[in-house]
Amino acid sequence: MVCGGFTCSKNALCALNVVYMLVGLLLIGVAAWGKGFGIVSSIHIIGGVIAIGVFLLLIAIIGLIGAVSHHQVMLFIYMVVLILVFIFQFIVSCSCLAMNRSQQEYFLNTTWRRMSNETRLNLEETLECCGFLNTTEARELFNKDVALCSHVCPDPHKCLSCGDKMLNHADEALKILGGVGLFFSFTEILGVWLAFRFRNQKDPRANPSAFL
């Protein structure tokens, strides 16, 4: 049977949703592993990653059930959700790729200010640094963070602040994040196209007089 047929479309849609399920389970597993080993202590970060994993898992399950049973309603819901996810993910990915250094600094500074002391201390220990950025505007907060910091720098003259360390890798990280996001956003468009095509194909094993 050619690849445009019913069986091929069904198998391709099932395979795509199995990949989504594996990615969702991977996100949940990595978040649980990070929390269990104390790599990330913030419940908000852990909860966010797990929520994304569960959401992706649910979408994949809906798509998989819809593909296996050729369920019209489930396939329609699957297409609508994937389109909404694509729009959001495409905008976020493009924003990551377009973000310059001053915008990165503003974003990281805002995020740092909203962090709890526990999360800041955890980051300082992981990155081996103290404080965010030693600038005139943030001098008071920087001194406060340094006073609470437990990391001891072997050479104070060569020590970078956490902001400097994060900004050194932020550009590369954002490009990777944006690129991966764009890749997955186009797989979502592929999923919508496969679901639409499969939804409008007739099951050769079904009653010839039945509607799709």
Swiss-Prot record:
Q: Which residues are glycosylated?
A: 100, 109, 117, 134
Quote the InterPro entries the UniProt record gives: Tetraspanin/Peripherin, Tetraspanin_animals
Q: How does it sit in the membrane?
A: Multi-pass membrane protein
Question: Any transmembrane segments, and where?
Answer: 13-33, 45-65, 73-93, 176-196
Q: Which Pfam families match?
A: Tetraspanin
Main localization is membrane
Q: Which residues lie on this side of the membrane: Cytoplasmic?
A: 1-12, 66-72, 197-212
Alphabetical keyword list:
Glycoprotein, Membrane, Transmembrane, Transmembrane helix
Domain of life of the organism encoding this protein: Eukaryota
Instruction: Tell me the compartments it is located in.
Output: Membrane
Q: What GO cellular-component annotations does this UniProt entry give?
A: membrane
**Which residue intervals are topologically Extracellular?**
34-44, 94-175
State the family named in the UniProt similarity comment for this chain: Belongs to the tetraspanin (TM4SF) family.
Please give the name of this protein: Tetraspanin-31-A
What is the originating organism of this protein? Xenopus laevis
Taxon lineage:
Eukaryota, Metazoa, Chordata, Craniata, Vertebrata
